[in-house]
Amino acid sequence: DKYIEYAKSTKINAFVVNIMDGTSIGYDSPVYEKYSPTAYQYANNTVAEYQEVIRKIKDAGFYAIGRLTTFNDSFFCQDHPEYAIADGSGEPLYVAASYWPSAFCRYVWEYKVALAIDAVETMDFDEIQFDYVRFPDNTDQYEASGDIDFRNEYGETKAQAIQRFLMYATDILHEYGVYVGADVFGETSGNYVTAYGQYWPAISNVVDVISGMPYPDHFSRNGTYRPWEHPYETLLDWAESAAKRQAETPTPALDRTWIQAYNAIQPPYNEYSVQEIGDEIRALKEEGLTGGFMAWNASCSLAKLEELRPLYEALE
């Protein structure tokens, strides 16, 4: 209730609510019971409790986005190791801080879309946002040695699998009257296919919303230059590249960017407050990325929101 009252007193117009976030399971959907009993066992809330929250958000006039982590799911891999990316011995491979269902496997597609449909029908979300819609990063050493099995039954490239999953999900979810979004790494604004299967034009061309995640503290330093100490310049450079990818896309999605709203996780751990976050927003607008933004701060601290009140009250 406090978050809703805060949002009503500013120009915030939407909430992003987790359906699932890796091993943090929002509520006890029967879809988990069917496809991933372990996830069902660890649900944090009941369906009724979640319905009440989303109803309050919607009744207050806000746009409700249901965020769903896709190919980062240790619980599913525990329940179905046969669909997990595996090592050379056939055992699920723990890489990039998780076990990963293979994006090549259609049963995984079926599960995630079934979960999205259930969320739309029971929670009345306006949009489903697929996060971790990619293969794991940092698999180079395994691929070089041949010590990894992606379960690639159809002989697809990674980028083909990601685009085809999103085409499948979008076609189905549009039948339920909702929009579909996809989160992509900041690197995806480059003019190449990434090693984890995200290619901006291929994704932007098939979903309704594409959300880059160009957090300045995720960029590599260049000598003594730390990008996270220069949020305006970092986002300006990134947005220029992202705008080019949008221009190359025949039917581009709406751009709605995730921006850094937390203190940097790299030295000198500089604070991100009204000035820094405002600089990020300004940079996006100057490069023509005007589809809106979402502010990422995993703590969801009300104290932090109050600190940022001048920024959110002044939004245009």
List each model region and its residues.
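Aromatic- and glycine-enriched glycan-recognition loops and surfaces
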Residues: 1-10, 37-60, 157-167, 237
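Aromatic-lined carbohydrate-binding/catalytic grooves of carbohydrate-active enzymes
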Residues: 10-45, 137-144, 305, 312
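Aromatic- and acidic-residue-enriched segments that line the glycan-binding/catalytic groove
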Residues: 28-40, 73-95, 133-152
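Substrate-binding cleft of secreted/luminal carbohydrate-active enzymes
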Residues: 207-221, 230-316
